[in-house]
Swiss-Prot record:
This is Dihydroxy-acid dehydratase ilvC, mitochondrial. InterPro entries: DHAD_IlvD/Edd, Dihydro-acid_dehy_C, DihydroxyA_deHydtase, DiOHA_6PGluconate_deHydtase_CS, ILV_EDD_C, ILV_EDD_N, IlvD/EDD_N. The active site is at residue 511. [2Fe-2S] cluster binds at residues 84, 157, 232. The keyword Calcium does not apply. Keywords: 2Fe-2S, Amino-acid biosynthesis, Branched-chain amino acid biosynthesis, Iron, Iron-sulfur, Lyase, Magnesium, Metal-binding, Mitochondrion, Virulence. Its main location: mitochondrion. The gene is ilvC. Mg(2+) binds at residues 116, 158, 485.
């Protein structure tokens, strides 16, 4: 008899049940009944003592039969102010439809999001990385407070993906991710109908400043770069993380390359219901999938595809959520043995929609598995191993030009390089594809704010004939605060034709859309007294990717003098403001965030 059918009667069996303590954890055990799927939600749907909980659930439209079903929290990062996210409510509705058809109860809820592209180059960018941890916190909060048995998350923009994975790792209940999907390429009518994307819009600014394009061409680019819903199209951060998460096994096959507006994405959403039911039946949790080997596969694929440097701190943070220690040197070890094969933007020619047309991520992973580059033994959200998932996947067409063969790589080793030295004793992350060379020596031009750099560029103060290392500092996780991305400065440099004569280093981050000679994630950051805060205009800086060095050519005596000067300015309150003196959400973030080499996590107990 269902509890809801007692109508005031209290049989002895139920009196006994109502006094029995129900565990709030997820014990592993054998239970052949269908109700075994609701191991968590039955803490509120079954006990007589939780009648008020049940009354609230009936008010949502649940039936008496529904009270015995597993409940799935469907968390979407939907908001209509960003193309990466504006379609996610539609996808969430389709996911719920699939969940209900699978005989489960689907409850939809939302979490926060920040558009990197809209906030880029403004103070709004300070909220971007912080949103990753807010997403994780909010999903964890709802999953814990509402007693849902499983989670399906639907992210779209850059920080969404690691945020939902961190929540899945913390909660550790059966979970899977449905990626919102990639946008279609745009088309520039004034440039022979060339394919364009969001990075084209960023670079158009520098091209306009130098007279390479007219105002009419510039407007044509920004008006047509983004033709609809979906994440930015190249191997930028969103597609990088989605691809990494697919190879780790936390999505259904093809999720990372299925375009946002496609039948394939629609079918994927519907299939998520049966997939999550199998995970519940077999008690497969994120901790069973997100193993050390899964993270090895992810690091390999990030290097193979020329993916975003943001993957370094995001994968470290996701690993931390499941108790796996990943550090920046792990990325270097993988990079040293992994070739760069993908001719994908930002450094290459093609976008994710092009990869989808030749078989997508599944065909890429099959190619890598056949070549022995990745390990296929790990469990995935299908309930099968990665290798099993790839058995019937078609090979790439013989004439495809997007993914190079191992015998003819773009670069024999990976593009992600971990550099240390007198400027970055705690590490830094370089994005070195080889096109910009592997060594750069130049004179420092220092800016405490990216707006000051843009103003200098507009005044034509950065000369093409001079080797310059642009230093943008006080942009770290505590200093920014929020470790904003430097896509606007890096794109402006490239657009202005300064990519070969200028390098850019920062204690902030770079967008997945950035390319050029770029070093970010410098630890320690300027706000906490890192050496980058001691650099002055005219100092010689050496970047050597082969020796993995980031050095400041200033003797120890002079550095000691500068440090005393810096400390005096700090004590007098004359340094740039950091998050450490702020209130509100950014101040709270600055006081809890770890450095970039430790993933910028905010829930550390150390």
């Amino acid at each position: 008899m269902l509890l809801s059918q007692t109508r005031g009667r209290l049989p002895s069996t139920l009196r006994s049940f109502s006094r029995r303590a129900l565990s709030t954890t997820l014990p592993r055990g054998k239970d052949s009944e269908e109700t075994a799927l609701n191991k968590v939600s039955r803490n509120v749907t079954q006990p007589i003592s939780q009648g008020a909980s049940q009354a609230m659930l009936y008010a949502t439209g649940l039936t008496e039969e529904d009270m015995n079903k597993a409940q799935v929290g469907i968390s979407s990062v939907w908001y209509n102010g960003n193309p990466c996210n504006m379609h996610l409510l539609d996808l969430s509705n389709r996911v719920r439809e699939g969940v209900q058809k699978a005989g489960l109860v689907g409850f939809q809820f939302n979490t926060v999001g920040v558009s990197d592209a809209i906030s880029m180059g403004t103070k709004g960018m300070r909220y971007s990385l912080q949103s990753r941890d807010l997403i994780a916190d909010s999903i964890e909060t709802v999953m814990g407070g509402q007693w849902y048995d499983a989670n399906i998350s639907i992210p779209g923009c850059d920080k969404n993906m690691p945020g939902v994975l961190m929540a899945m790792g913390r909660v550790n209940r059966p979970s899977l991710m449905v990626y919102g999907g990639t946008i279609k390429p745009g088309c520039a009518r004034t440039q022979n109908n060339a394919d364009i994307d969001i990075v084209s819009a960023f670079q158009a600014y520098g091209q306009f400043l130098t007279g390479e394009i007219t105002e009419n061409q510039r407007f044509d680019i920004i008006r047509n770069a983004c033709p609809g819903g979906g994440a930015c199209g190249g191997m930028y951060t969103a597609n990088t993380m989605a691809t990494a998460i697919e190879v780790m096994g936390m999505t259904l096959p093809g999720s990372s390359s299925n375009p946002a507006e496609s039948k394939a994405k629609d079918l994927e959403c519907l299939a998520a219901g049966e997939a999550i039911k199998r995970l519940l039946k077999e008690d497969i949790r994120p901790s069973d999938i997100l193993t050390r080997q899964a993270f090895e596969n992810a690091m390999i694929v990030v290097n193979i595809t020329g993916g975003s440097t943001n993957a370094v701190l995001h994968l470290i943070a996701i690993a931390d959520s499941v108790g796996i220690k990943l550090d920046i040197e792990d990325f270097q070890k993988v990079s040293d043995r992994t070739p760069f094969l993908a001719d994908l933007k930002p450094s290459g020619k093609y976008v994710m929609a092009d990869l989808h047309n030749i078989g997508g991520t599944p065909s890429l992973l099959k190619f890598l598995l056949k070549e022995g580059v990745i390990d296929g033994s790990g469990m995935t959200v299908t309930g099968e191993t990665l290798a099993k998932n790839l058995e019937k996947v078609p090979d790439f067409p013989a004439d495809q030009k997007i993914i190079r063969p191992l015998s003819n790589p773009i670069k024999k080793t990976g593009h992600i390089q971990i550099l240390r030295g007198s400027l970055a004793p705690g590490g830094s992350v370089g994005k070195i594809t080889g096109k910009e060379g592997t060594r750069f020596v130049g004179k420092a031009r220092v800016f405490d704010d990216e707006d000051d750099f843009i103003a200098a560029l507009e005044r034509n103060e950065i000369k093409k004939e001079e080797k310059t290392v642009v230093v943008i500092r006080y942009t770290g996780p505590k200093g920014g605060p929020g470790m904003p991305e430097m896509l606007k400065p890096s794109s402006a440099l490239m657009g202005a034709g300064l990519g070969s004569s200028c390098a850019l280093i920062t204690d902030g981050r770079f967008s997945g859309g950035s390319h050029g000679f770029l070093i970010g994630h410098i630890v320690p950051e300027a706000a906490v007294g890192g050496p980058i805060g001691l650099v002055k205009d005219g100092d010689t800086i050496t970047i050597d990717a082969e020796k993995r060095l980031l050095d400041l050519d200033v003797d120890e005596t002079e550095l000691a003098r500068r440090r005393k000067e810096w400390e005096a300015l700090r004590d007098a309150g004359k340094l740039p403001q950091t998050g450490l003196t702020m209130r509100g959400t950014l101040g709270k973030y600055a006081r809890t965030v770890k450095d970039a080499s430790h993933g910028c996590i905010t829930d550390s107990v150390e």
